[in-house]
């Protein structure tokens, strides 16, 4: 099940943790959940500035100090900034954020693994035996023949798209599918996404997808 209590996304300073304090029993429960969520991408967040967006009436100065100390020690962030979560921002818990995006201008070859805590756009191919993992969307401007894991942090809105979608395996938010033995190349770009907990693949339609 998707955890909508804390949402992590990129921003111009580094990373932004949007926290819905209404869904936590107390501060310590929230802190444990935040540390657990950030720990999954610790190597990406090291040295980053973290902006914590939440309803500040739930957190006092002592707790703010504790949160900073824990995150400095365990996640190795560089700085921590707090900002008030406005009412209009509540929509983030049901909406989709693109977050930060990385462009990779190379082919992912057999035995290589590409991992990123955001969206990945690969200008090249993903060969058989190659592996790509991303917290967000994975877009391959070429042939996708290896393994791709999108929404690797539980993002059920992530998609996988490629000019030619012939994967060994694709996964979105932990849901996995493999190409059938009688798979036939379509000759047009396709998009894989989740629909009612199942991965479906459909032709790419520019008017339908506006990521």
Curated annotation (Swiss-Prot):
Domain of life per record: Bacteria
Swiss-Prot/TrEMBL keywords: Cell cycle, Cell division, Septation
InterPro entries linked to this entry: CAP/MinC_C, MinC, MinC_C_sf, MinC_N_1, Septum_form_inhib_MinC_C
UniProt entry tagged with the keyword Amino-acid biosynthesis: no
GO biological process: cell morphogenesis; division septum assembly; regulation of cell septum assembly
SUPFAM superfamilies found in the cross-reference section: Cell-division inhibitor MinC, C-terminal domain (SSF63848)
This protein's record includes keyword Cell cycle: yes
PANTHER family per record: SEPTUM SITE-DETERMINING PROTEIN MINC
Record-linked HAMAP family: MinC
Function: Cell division inhibitor that blocks the formation of polar Z ring septums. Rapidly oscillates between the poles of the cell to destabilize FtsZ filaments that have formed before they mature into polar Z rings. Prevents FtsZ polymerization.
Entry's family note: Belongs to the MinC family.
Subunit structure: Interacts with MinD and FtsZ.
Protein name per the record: Probable septum site-determining protein MinC
Organism: Clostridium perfringens (strain 13 / Type A)
